[in-house]
Each structure stands twice: as structure tokens, then as C-alpha cells.
Amino acid sequence: MLAATVLTLALLGNVHACSKGTSHKAGIVCRITKPALLVLNQETAKVIQSAFQRANYPNITGEKAMMLLGQVKYGLHNIQISHLSIASSRVELVEAKSIDVSIQNVSVVFKGTLKYGYTTAWGLGIDQSVDFEIDSAIDLQINTQLTCDSGRVRTDAPDCYLSFHKLLLHLQGEREPGWIKQLFTNFISFTLKLVLKGQICKEINIISNIMADFVQTRAASILSDGDIGVDISLTGDPIITASYLESHHKGYFIYKNVSEDLPLPTFSPALLGDSRMLYFWFSEQVFHSLAKVAFQDGRLMLSLMGDEFKAVLETWGFNTNQEIFQEVVGGFPSQAQVTVHCLKMPRISCQNKGVVVNSSVMVKFLFPRPDQQHSVAYTFEEDIMTTVQASYSKKKLFLSLLDFQITPKTVSNLTESSSESVQSFLQSMITTVGIPEVMSRLEAVFTALMNSKGLSLFDIINPEIITRDGFLLLQMDFGFPEHLLVDFLQSLS
């Protein structure tokens, strides 16, 4: 249940205020559907077991007037769990209200020490201590509500019910009813039920919020790198319908702890379905913000030197033996240098045909001369527009170049006699080698970054990346994220 409730909120992050209302302003939207909750609910038992085991069971003391014995004082001390198992659980979404989880046949054996005392008719004080076991069978009903608290998800289970089908007291391992057992069972059972309900429900609520913080902290880490982070705080309370959970996030990129507080676009719930397990909706504004921080952080540049430059040319099938190549590089291709960098922040837009990137770049070629004392530099300034479609398969990101346009702006260091041929040659190099190489490196960089954050540990099934005018949609199915649950349970110990 807790896994089904909180692991779904893996985008939730930093602390900011939540707005109220029915409009959904967001840069990023996460929707998790009923089929996903059923998958996550598979491991409910492990989290519930942690709640039972972590709960603090206080000593139970009391006094009871009993026939023949008079006033009997008693106490159950050092109550602990010696055995616990869970038969099954079910999860349901209640429209605009809660996530309801029913847990059936929780078999729990408690153990501890029973101390009791009384005064006989002859004035003799009797004090006894005996070990006990309590064999119980319990059903739980937990209705969890999700709210936004200062930009973070909070969970609350105001409705938490325990139904006891069995509550048997065994003293010192004896299974046959004894007179002490008969005397104590009835009036201890009622008190014990109240204590167990209070402590277990309290611990379930505590663990659910610990898990919420755990997942949100992990999400913030996944979506950060160096000085770049993402403000994924909630813009309002999560939405619960009969078929999905949905959360809305700001999606501002943060650079060196500074982010722009721009107006957020309005999200329409009709843009997402409920046939896949998990949906992410990214507004075009998110990619604009990404381009800005990447440019500010100096990440939009590439430098190739010597043998690496020659190897790249050969990788893309560029003929390095042609005469003009030898002429341009001065006979020393292993000493050539090429640098590429953006002159200003790229513009990124989402369209039906793909993600369109408009960038102004400078490409500089530096080739040594035969005396190796001098070099010749050729510099190109160009506007490049590329249309890209992304896909994810076998734990790798793939970028497909659908279309590109290059508009030359300025060219320097070309003599009149060589300008046309050299410019054509270098332009061909940019087209046939430069753009594919940049795409290939972006694939590798993004894949390595995602894997370093643990994305490769997730069992992502049939992911689809779909672009539409103004937004990008990511939809997928998945297997249970066992590694996240293991990490969380270890953090509790």
C-alpha cells in the first residue's frame, strides 16, 4: 500500500508553496494509473511488516477486581513481534478522496512478559511473572489521502481500521487453557486491541511520510547534475480519480541555486490516457529552461584534437585520403583541432514532427602548416535547425535526425582562390560528420547521465516518446522497482 501510494510520486521534490484551485498549471505532469498501482501493491507486505516491526508497543498495565482474587494488578511488558505474515492486499482509488487499501489475514505473534499480583484472603501478597505469546489474525483497512504541503507530498491516513479475527493468549508456551489464562484473556484483549491499533496506525502514517521524503529526495537527486537541478515542487494537491493519480510540478531548471519563476502553462487532463502504467507530460517551457542552463554551464561545446578528430572522420565514412583533405590539413591530420560551441542559447520547440532545435554555432578548424610553426584557422558561424525524434530502448537513449537546415552566416580566413572549394569541403565535413557526431555524443552523454542516476535499474517496458505542438509526452509500463524498496527498507534499519 505504501509502495503503491508513495513510489508513484517519484517526481516530487523541492519546497515551495502550493496553490489551490481546479486549474492545473504545470511544467511537468506525472500520471500513474490503476494497472501501475496493482504492480506496486505486490510488495505491500514488506512495507506493512516494517510498520509492525518498527512500532513501539508500550507496556500495558491495569487493575481489575476479580472474583475470589480481589483486586488484581497486571502488566504486559516488553511486547515484541516474533512472527508476521500477510496473505493478500487490494488497492482501490476513491475519486477525489483517497487511496484505499485492504490487507487481509495479517498473522502476527506477539511475545513478552505478563506480571500480575494480588493479595489472598489471608493477607498474603502474590506476585507472579510469566512469559506469554499472543496469537492474532488481523485485517487492516487503510485510506490514505495525499496533500501538498509547502510544495511536497504529504500522506495522511485518518481512516485506519484493524479488525481482529483472533487474539489468543498463551502463557509459558502452554496451549491448554489454564485458570490464569481464562481470567486474563477477556479483559486484557480489549485493552490490547486499542493499543495495537493506535501504535500500528501511527507507525503506518510515519512510514508513509518517511517514504514520501525518501522518494522525493531520490527524485531530486536523479534530476540534478553538478550546478544544474530541477524545481519539481508541486503546484497543487495531487489529483485522485477512479483510474489514476496525477501530480503537477513546476519543472523550472535551477542553475547554481537560482531559477526563473516564469508563468506556467495550463495542462489539460485530456492530453493523457490511462491505458499505460505511467505518463509524463513535459511542456515546451521545460526544454527552453534546460537549454538555458546547459548554455550557462558551458556544456554546449565540443573539442576534437589530433587522432580523435581523424578517428571521428573515419567513423562516419569521411574520406581522409582525398586530395583537398590533405591540402587543408597541411599533411598533419593527427595535429588538427576542431572546436564547436553555441554562440547563444538554443531555442527548443516541440512540434508534431519532433523536437526542433534552433542554434547559432561557431565551428573553428585549426590546421598546422608543414613547418609546424604556424597554423591556419578557418571559422564558420552558422544557424542550424535540426528536427529530432527520441526513443529509449535496451537502457539507451537514441536520437534520430529527421531533418536539418544550415544557414551560413560568416566565414573567415579563406582566400579568394580557395574560398569556394575549401568552404564547400569544410561545409561537407560539418554536414556529414559534425551533426551526426554531435547527435551521437548527446546520446552517450544523456544515457550515461541517466544510468549514473540509476535509471538502468528500472524495468521500463515499451517506452514511447511522443512530441506534439507545445509539449512532449513520455508513456510506458514498468516492473516493480525492487531496488528502490530495498534501499528504502535499509534506510529504516
From Swiss-Prot:
Domain of life of the organism encoding this protein: Eukaryota
Signal peptide from the UniProt entry: 1-17
Reported function: Involved in the transfer of neutral lipids, including cholesteryl ester and triglyceride, among lipoprotein particles. Allows the net movement of cholesteryl ester from high density lipoproteins/HDL to triglyceride-rich very low density lipoproteins/VLDL, and the equimolar transport of triglyceride from VLDL to HDL. Regulates the reverse cholesterol transport, by which excess cholesterol is removed from peripheral tissues and returned to the liver for elimination.
A GO cellular component entry from the record: high-density lipoprotein particle
Tissue: Probably primarily expressed in liver and adipose tissues. Detected in adrenal gland, mesenteric fat, spleen and aorta.
The keyword Transferase belongs to this UniProt entry's keyword annotation: no
Family according to the record: Belongs to the BPI/LBP/Plunc superfamily. BPI/LBP family.
Protein name, as recorded: Cholesteryl ester transfer protein
Localization in the cell: Secreted
TM region(s), chain numbering: none
Species whose genome carries this gene: Macaca fascicularis
Disulfide cysteine pairs (residue numbers): 160-201
Gene Ontology BP annotations: cholesterol homeostasis; cholesterol metabolic process; cholesterol transport; high-density lipoprotein particle remodeling; low-density lipoprotein particle remodeling; phosphatidylcholine metabolic process; phospholipid homeostasis; reverse cholesterol transport
PROSITE patterns: LBP_BPI_CETP
Chemical reaction(s) catalysed: cholesteryl (9Z-octadecenoate)(in) = cholesteryl (9Z-octadecenoate)(out); 1,2,3-tri-(9Z-octadecenoyl)-glycerol(in) = 1,2,3-tri-(9Z-octadecenoyl)-glycerol(out); cholesteryl (9Z,12Z)-octadecadienoate(in) = cholesteryl (9Z,12Z)-octadecadienoate(out)
SMART domains, per database record: BPI1, BPI2
Induction trigger: Up-regulated by high-fat, high-cholesterol diet.
